[in-house]
């Protein structure tokens, strides 16, 4: 525990202390840590993540809750467009395994609020044409609500990376996965 690995049950029987320690958060300062695997937030408490089996290609999301934020995500986390081309993103929320489009979320590009750029009733937003860049633009969304004179976040942090290339330039494709099979047995049987 001294090194930060706090893998024991707390007074309520939860084993998520390791996650709080990893993030340097005092449990009293957060309503909870939300968690989802492949956008399924039906069992979203971080203590269940410690026993979760993860497979290649799984998407894990953790977020610190201020109050009761919903898991939010862009349906495309990576996209490439040409210069002078507009990208369209769709923002959704998950409440358990029920999904809805997220309207009224403000959009940020590389950490800067884009005035007047918010998601519509279908969760969609059309980004302005951006200049080509060597590094992808980092697109995020934020939605807040006022209650009891206090403003708080109602969705988790959602992100998407947008690469903008010169018009006519070809985007590079990379192999995401390879399946290897033992062909030696097959070859020896043929001999």
Feature map (PLM): residue ranges:
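Ubiquitin-like/PB1-type beta-grasp interaction modules and other compact soluble beta-rich domains
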Residues: 1-191
């Amino acid at each position: 525990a001294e090194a930060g690995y706090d893998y024991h049950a707390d007074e309520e029987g939860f084993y998520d202390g390791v996650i709080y320690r990893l993030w340097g958060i005092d449990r009293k300062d957060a309503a909870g840590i939300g968690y989802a695997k492949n956008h399924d937030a039906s069992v979203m408490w971080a203590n269940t993540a410690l026993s979760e089996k993860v497979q290649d290609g799984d998407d894990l999301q953790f977020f610190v809750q201020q109050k009761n934020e919903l898991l939010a995500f862009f349906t495309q986390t990576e996209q490439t467009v040409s210069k002078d081309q507009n990208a369209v993103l769709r923002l959704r929320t998950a409440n358990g395994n029920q999904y809805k489009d997220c309207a009224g979320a403000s959009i940020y590009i590389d950490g800067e609020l884009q005035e007047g750029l918010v998601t519509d009733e279908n969760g969609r937003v059309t980004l302005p044409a951006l200049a080509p860049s060597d590094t992808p633009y980092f697109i995020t969304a934020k939605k807040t609500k006022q209650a009891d004179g206090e403003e708080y976040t109602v969705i988790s942090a959602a992100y998407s990376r947008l690469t903008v290339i010169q018009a006519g330039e070809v985007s590079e494709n990379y192999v995401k996965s390879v399946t290897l099979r033992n062909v030696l047995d097959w070859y020896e049987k043929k001999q």
